Amino acid sequence: MKKTWWKESVVYQIYPKSFKDSNGDGIGDIRGIIEKLDYLKELGVNVLWISPMLESPQDDNGYDISDYRKIYKDYGTMEDYETLLAEAHKRGIKILMDLVVNHTSDEHSWFVESRKSKDNPYRDYYIWRNPVNGKEPNNWGGVFGGSAWEYDAQTDMYYLHLFSKKQPDLNWENEKVRREVYDMMNFWCEKGIDGFRMDVISMISKDQKFPDGEMNNGLYGDFGPYSVHGPRIHEFLHEMNQEVLSKYDVMTVGETSGVTIEEAQKYAGDDREELNMVFQFEHIEIGGGDYGKWTTERYDFKEFKKIMIKWQEELAGKAWNSLFLGNHDQPRSVSRFGNDNPAYRDISAKMLATCLHMMQGTPYVYQGEELGMTNVYFDKLEDYRDIESLHYFTELTETGRLTPEYMMKCLMLRSRDNARTPMQWDTSAGAGFTTGKPWIKVNPNYQQINAADQLKDPDSVFHYYQKLIRLRKEMDIIVYGEFEALYRDHDQIFAYIRKLESEKLLTVCNFSAQEAEMELPETFTEGAQCLITNMGRKVFDRKIILNPYEAFVLYKK
């Protein structure tokens, strides 16, 4: 297998608005990130993916960009960004930029021009269609609720926005649009960034017939079959690779919701000349109800395990996995997949990390995950800031599909704001995130969960993550070893072996709050070394009773 730096890296995702505020305005910023580079170096991560920091009206927290070559004023200046790059590189840390090119903000100069008239030179930068029978061109619904089309009275036409109406979709069929994007990417690569995480990149190619979508319990049709992994997607990404990516030593990861194993190989196969890896969301999207993620049901562990094993086995040797359990769009991983009850929070956070970091692929740590930060469980609608949560609350309650009480429970479990509360640095007011009033409330458990306390405690979640990351740097088997699943049908245990030449590694995790019984594979009963354990287990007999949420890793050469 070909060795590359991005296969051997551990990526840390920063959501800049909530990471560290350096000037007391309640909003995280670039100087705040610079202040914390030594903390990140101590953790051991060597790549930072930073969510968008470019000029934006912040309708969707920066995923609505109004200028691709300017830093958002509340985050700082271009000079600050250049300092961040230099300081990170000095510490051996690379920087990935969040590339948002499925859509722009409606305040981007291209769109301001585009909507002026039907013959404006920028008209074809976006997707405009005539009304059909005085209504929307088709029945597609947007990701954040409502129609995916917005009527513009000035020219009596509709524009497409798969996300909010302030996020009009770019028309990738137009070669001028593609040139603009590639020029902009080259601009940032020349500045010295180390790669791109590509936001909803699988949506840039649309079926130009724009047919109606299937109605799935909602008010609108599903655009998925016509604009996710669309007809020209691989042609566009190959062109992007030729025009930009192949010229630099950069890392790329595409956000590709709904991707299959076969499709992932097209995006990220070694011989494809498109991307290095993709984010698949199959394990994240399990446990959906009639209205997608808006449900109070727990996830199905066996289904989760089956999906994780499938991606390990079927992508092996063909494309590279991205390993993650959380990001800025998901609830906190310890609340979703572990147990955030204080009795089990730390051990289940360590167990989840063990399970993920011993697999083949590039692991991603979302800010605060290394501390075991939990969902915030806001119980008042006015505390929420997330556009998706607020849109769906209105849509699903006003149409009588869900009661306000039930929808509040769904938000507490599934809202994106769970991941967006401020980073918990210490026990001071504002959790050390800000000296001012934070843009969103701090999780009240910052007194118990914070970086300052964990840095002092050798048994903390932070130090456990640090050790997992160090092991990955030291041992090729963790990065490149083959994967073999054990206990496929067990209701509680997730266990697997990794192999590289004469070396073997066994990872065992109990995903439940009950004890679980297992037999060690014979190879590991004698002379195996315990690399890491979340409960200090010393004795590894043939028969083992695992404690709730226990995890350990054994190594044999």
Language model feature labels by segment:
Residues 1-529, 533-557:
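Active-site and adjacent substrate-binding regions of carbohydrate-active enzymes
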